[in-house]
């Protein structure tokens, strides 16, 4: 793949594209299932006012909810993944719009669900479990729902909130289209006057260069462009903040932070303890940055100096094929069953590998009923190999959860999710250090791992400052 110019989607070889045909063979098949989803409000309405009627009725409704979840999973994964592979493709933006309209209709039709379920008396619900043992499958889900009784509104109010769903998503959608589909950055120029294309995918490799002129130029290209649209970005962020605050207040939470954490069953105190722990140990970060400044030999350390390795002449170029081989070896402690799933993902196009014009930036894993999908923007760097290990950790977690858990429990919260991914990163680092004798490369790897602490717990905690008292 060329590192100079980003290819169009049509120019990317098939083996490096994810196999979305595993969900739907054609767009027409997707449209057929969309019609099924559009018919769901009528089926949902048949249960209105009846959830406390009998164990059989409640069980049948929960089964219908599972059916809708599976249908939405397929429809949502196909439409979102198609849109993410080229955000400028209006066709799949249209798919997402149609799907969101159907989602809103389904959620609106089911607005009676939570008020009716929390109104069932505890003794009666226990009798339901006795009358129909199959209903016990949903006990934890029902208990979790009933735990939120203080934040559940009337049926009419719940319906209004359901109707705001598409509007609430707008700030995020606007920013995504602006950043991934519309924004273009001027080329960066190195010390020899050579131009380098700047994209979301190429930015980090550029600021990791040992050429300080190139690093500064790439930084000014990226952040200078965003700065030109600072009012647009600020207005979009403001709209997002207003949206989350609206939903928090509507549901009678003390704050948007409490509302966000409630669904994960994580107390606000745990979140605040994390922030305090990072702040109480920031002196280590200051020592590290001071050492970085000294090793780089610069009078002033700028933001564009933070990513370049402090170990000269030890850069590691790792192709995607090499990254796959190394990750397979590094994750051997996970066992043969785990490795078999990993190989299946590598060999059967679970991964969309390279950057192309309009492709969503960054990397992620998306669980799907057929199998997970992983979006990468691979650049043959050490960081990208760690990203592969990280995202495949999420992917295999999703695969195993979907395989072994009922539909209602197959999802998981982010606090659990990151264990599977960061464990893979730790195993990869352990493997690389164990199998690297060159002192410079070992130092390079240790520097990389230190950077993960700076760019993850430290940087992310810094981003929480506006939501806490530590400003």
Indicate where each model-derived feature is located.
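A sensor for short, sequence-defined functional sites
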Residues: 113-117, 121, 334-338, 443, ...
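Auxiliary, metal-adjacent structural segments of Zn-dependent hydrolase domains
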Residues: 313-368, 381-382
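Catalytic glutamate of the conserved HExxH
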Residues: 387, 391, 395
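Post-HEXXH active-site segment of zinc metalloproteases
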Residues: 398-419
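Post-HExxH zinc-binding segment in Zn-dependent metallohydrolases
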Residues: 412-438
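Conserved small/polar residues in nucleotide/adenosyl-binding loops
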Residues: 461-467
């Amino acid at each position: 793949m060329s590192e100079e110019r980003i290819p169009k989607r049509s120019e990317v070889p098939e083996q490096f594209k994810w196999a979305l045909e595993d969900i739907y063979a054609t767009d027409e098949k997707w449209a057929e299932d969309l019609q099924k989803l559009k018919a769901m409000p009528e089926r949902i309405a048949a249960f209105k006012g009846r959830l406390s009627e009998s164990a059989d009725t409640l069980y049948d409704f929960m089964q219908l909810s599972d059916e809708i979840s599976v249908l939405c999973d397929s429809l949502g994964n196909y439409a979102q993944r198609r849109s993410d592979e080229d955000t400028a493709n209006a066709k799949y933006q249209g798919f997402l719009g149609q799907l969101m309209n159907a989602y809103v209709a389904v959620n609106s039709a089911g607005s009676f669900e939570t008020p009716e379920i929390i109104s069932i008396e505890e003794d009666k619900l226990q009798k339901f479990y006795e009358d129909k043992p199959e209903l016990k499958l949903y006990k934890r889900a029902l208990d979790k729902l009933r735990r939120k009784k203080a934040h559940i509104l009337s049926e009419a109010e719940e319906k209004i909130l359901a109707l705001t769903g598409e509007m609430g998503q707008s700030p995020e959608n606007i920013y995504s289209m602006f950043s991934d589909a519309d924004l273009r950055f001027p080329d960066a120029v190195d010390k020899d006057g050579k131009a380098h294309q700047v994209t979301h995918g190429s930015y980090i490799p550029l600021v990791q260069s040992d050429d300080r002129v190139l690093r500064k130029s790439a930084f000014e290209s990226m952040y200078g462009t965003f700065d030109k649209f600072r009012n647009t970005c600020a207005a979009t962020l403001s709209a997002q903040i207003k949206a989350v605050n609206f939903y928090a207040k509507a549901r009678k939470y003390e704050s948007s932070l409490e509302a966000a954490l409630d669904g994960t069953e994580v107390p606000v105190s745990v979140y605040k303890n994390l922030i305090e722990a990072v702040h109480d140990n920031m002196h280590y970060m200051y020592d590290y940055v001071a050492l970085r400044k000294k090793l780089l030999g610069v009078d002033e350390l700028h933001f564009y100096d933070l990513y370049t390795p402090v170990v000269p002449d030890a850069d590691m170029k790792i192709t995607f094929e090499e990254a796959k081989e190394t990750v397979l070896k590094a994750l051997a402690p996970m066992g043969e069953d785990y490795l078999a799933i990993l190989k299946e993902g590598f060999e059967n196009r679970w991964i969309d590998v390279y950057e192309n014009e309009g492709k969503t930036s960054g990397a992620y894993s998306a669980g799907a009923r057929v199998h997970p999908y992983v979006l990468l923007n691979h650049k043959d760097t050490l960081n990208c190999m760690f990203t592969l290990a990280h995202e495949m950790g999420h992917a295999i977690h999703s695969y195993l959860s979907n395989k072994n858990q009922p539909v209602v429990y197959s999802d998981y919260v982010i606090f659990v999710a990151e264990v599977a991914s960061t464990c893979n990163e730790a195993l990869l680092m352990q493997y690389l250090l164990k199998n690297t004798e060159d002192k410079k490369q070992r130092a390079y790897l240790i520097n990389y791992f230190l950077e993960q602490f700076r760019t993850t717990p430290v940087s992310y905690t810094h981003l929480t400052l506006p939501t806490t008292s530590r400003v």
